Amino acid sequence: QDYKSTKTLVHYLVNAAGKNANLLMNIGPQPDGELPAVALERLAEMGEWMKIYGETIYGTRGGIVAPHDWGVTTQKGNRLFVHILNLKDKSLFLPLGNQKVKKAFDFASKKAVKVQKCEGGVVLNLGEVPTEMDKVVEIAL
């Protein structure tokens, strides 16, 4: 059978969160009542991802930056989570208007991300093209 990759499932989840939606996954049992091993494997892998990044999904709403081809944002209070799913560049413009950015950092490593103020928003200087399935930058507003 054809199962989605963990990366695809994580992208579905992140996109749903960034668009104020829910993700329902239809995983049916086999004739013997057991769940398919591949489905259990994917769920376990998503669980490992959620152990690190769950805070950027649970209890959030779609962020103040609308969804784009590069990804989505989620937000909890003054914490904006930038989920970079598909970026072919080392920098990313965020149309934040006059919103002040106190700090920005890589969510997983906690390393600072350089922020450059520009007309209409800010540019995140990532240092390299993201290769993770979901690079998350947290911005304190």
Predicted regions span which residues?
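Mature catalytic domains of secreted/periplasmic carbohydrate-active enzymes
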Residues: 1-141
